[in-house]
Amino acid sequence: MPRHKTRILLVDGDSTVQHLRALMLRMQGYDVDTAADLESARTVIAAAPHYNLVIVDVGLFAGPGLEFCEEIKQRHPHQKVLMQVDGHLYLGRESCPDKVVSKQDGPQHFVYEVQRMLEAT
């Protein structure tokens, strides 16, 4: 469990997946804000720009998800970004997300990868 509240923004258009993933992260002691689409995520980040981690579901947003990631990195270069994908996605070394996680790997792997990313901070 984190010693202090670690802030995470979870962006996912599937309300069921969003709710379950946010619940899992809250059970680990994280402070989780959610957004159902990229426009809402932009609004949340503008109002409260410091998140320890931003998680974006690329499966629902395709190209715009990667553009959103690049936008975050331009405004906040040290912001950690994890992308969730429905299958497997290969991105070059210079691409935006710090980590890509497949939804096929399951919820325990998702929490594990989030913890690993946050510990590396």
Regions found by a protein language model. Name each.
Residues M1-S15, A22, R42, E70, ...:
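Non-catalytic signal-transmission and effector/linker regions of two-component phosphorelay proteins
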Residues R7, D31, H50-N52, K80:
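Structural signature of beta-strand start/N-cap positions in the alpha/beta core
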Residues S15-D33:
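Two-component/phosphorelay signaling modules centered on CheY-like receiver
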Residues T34-L53:
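Acidic, metal-coordinating helix/loop segments flanking the phosphotransfer/catalytic sites
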Residues A46-P49, E71-Q79:
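Conserved phosphotransfer cores of two-component systems
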Residues V56-I72:
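Conserved phosphotransfer microenvironments
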Residues E71, R93-S102, G106:
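As written
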